[in-house]
Amino acid sequence: MLQQRAADKYHSPMLWTNTCCSHPREGETTVEAGKRRLQEEMGFCTELTDVMSFIYKAPFDNGLTEHELDHILIGYYEEPPIINPDEVAAWRWALPEDIRKDIAAHPEKYTEWFKIIFEKYEEKLGN
């Protein structure tokens, strides 16, 4: 499940990306933060597993730069989400091979961090 970021986001608006993003609050685990933001952004809860982490740095067109430790959390959910329009403009189901082809053909449609996440996750799976 991919989401398209809302038009009013301060960076990377209207770009396609991972299902949700979060930063843990004080005393909150990475998985707890992921569950919280999944509910806030996509309107559902599911069990999540932390499968890997990595550090990335990416500059944005608005002069900001992100330099973060990212965790990739995986969960399973088969129903349509109830998106928060302040966070999400649209969503879609996508197969990994279709994502790979679309990123190759249209990298400008995806967030910088998602392109890194997708590549790292495929490497981990051995694709």
Regions found by a protein language model. Name each.
Residues 28, 40-41, 68, 87:
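Acidic-residue sensor for enzyme active/binding pockets
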Residues 14-16, 20, 54-60, 64-127:
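Nudix hydrolase/Nudix homology domain
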Residues 44-54:
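A short coil-to-beta-strand element that immediately follows conserved catalytic motifs
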Residues 2, 50-52, 93:
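Structural signal for conserved beta-strand scaffold positions within catalytic alpha/beta enzyme cores
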Residues 42-43, 77:
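A broad structural signal for alpha-helix termini and local helix breaks/kinks
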Residues 1-36, 40, 105:
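Conserved Nudix-box catalytic region and its N-terminal flanking loop in Nudix hydrolases
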Residues 3-7, 11, 46, 64, ...:
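N-proximal short alpha-helices
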